[in-house]
Amino acid sequence: AHLHLHSTYSLLDGAIRPADLVNKVKELGMKSVAVTDHGNMFGAIEFYDAAKKAGVKPIIGYEAYVAPGSRFEKRNQEDLVDGRAYHLILLAKNKQGYKNLTKLASKAYTEGLYYKPRIDYELLAQHSEGLVGLTACLAGEVNRLIYRQQMDKAAELSGRLNEIFGKGNFFLEIQNHGIPEQIEVAKGAAELS
């Protein structure tokens, strides 16, 4: 199953409608698929309904933007080390996970909105029950550390995320779209695991 996928609800990053997605997934013989739109869950119900109708198991997710510090901190992006929030894939394992996803997505807008709707690790730790975490794309914090060859810091953060999500609920995501940086990070992730 694809566990990191953007629909039309990921503005400027996703092109497929939820109904078209589940129809294609079914056509390919896949039994399940996740939708992890950037910073929102606007399409979650539409996706869930379409997947159920098509006989495909829907995995509800969310690609969170994680503030480099506190979600309450608002300052010029130029002052930030990386200039933006990190990405982190969150997947609901169960009903409690879905509730926590909705809390995180809502609080990202009401408490952490600064250019993007952001959460932080404090909020994630409070609402991690029932969630699975993936390191996301090259914009994920662990992956950025790997790319910079800061393996000790990447291992430390991976350990922290493993504690937040609980054993067996945090994974290093490997992507290969032919981008040299992804291949380099994949090698580092394999070394880290």
Model regions: which residues?
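Phosphodiester-processing cores and adjacent nucleic acid-binding clamps
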Residues: 1-193
